[in-house]
Regions:
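Acidic Ser/Thr-enriched surface turn/capping motif at secondary-structure junctions
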Residues: 1-171
Length: 171
């Protein structure tokens, strides 16, 4: 009689959340919600990209900003978050690794971590905050001699005209 033997491979997984860090402190606070549509790329320890996904709703509970790479053999991995229109919160703030931001603020990469077979490491997350860029508005004021609303050749600019900017509430 022959016995067929096989090795059971236990796969690992890595993931967590990308959230809107409204106070920019690098800590997931109560009320700070996840962000869907952020690209997360998975790399092995040699720096080879293994896959990517967009953050989405968690299938358990439905919270926004969830990602997970599953069915990974034991080994070294890291992820890189694409900040999109946001900026990264400070990295590794506080003592609780489950609620801090793990993304390097410059590169978006996490540290390299080694997963063992069967490990489910859901602690690799990123805090993002909205960028408030300074804005400007302006153009040119001219004497519209023919009153057609179009600046024609020969219609000269006017100095000393006061321009007032209002918000949507008229203030």
């Amino acid at each position: 009689w022959d016995a067929g033997l096989y090795e059971t491979i236990e796969f690992a997984s890595i993931g967590d959340y990308v959230w809107l860090d409204s106070d920019k402190d690098g800590i997931q606070d109560a009320g700070e919600t996840g962000i869907n549509g952020i690209e997360v790329k998975l790399f092995n320890g040699a720096g080879t990209e293994l896959g990517s996904m967009l953050t989405t709703n968690n299938p358990v509970g439905g919270a926004d900003g969830w990602y997970s790479f599953t069915n990974l053999p034991a080994g070294a991995y890291y992820v890189i978050f694409d900040k999109g229109i946001y900026d990264f919160s400070p990295q590794n703030i506080g003592a609780n690794d489950l609620i801090d931001s793990d993304a390097n603020p410059t590169t978006g990469a996490t540290a390299l971590t080694t997963l063992t077979g069967g490990e489910n490491d859901m602690s690799w997350d990123a805090g993002l905050y909205e960028i408030n860029l300074p804005a400007s508005i302006g153009d040119y004021v001219w004497f519209d001699a023919d009153q057609d609303g179009v600046q024609d050749a020969g219609e000269t600019g006017l100095n000393g005209i006061e321009v007032t900017l209002y918000n949507i509430f008229g203030v």
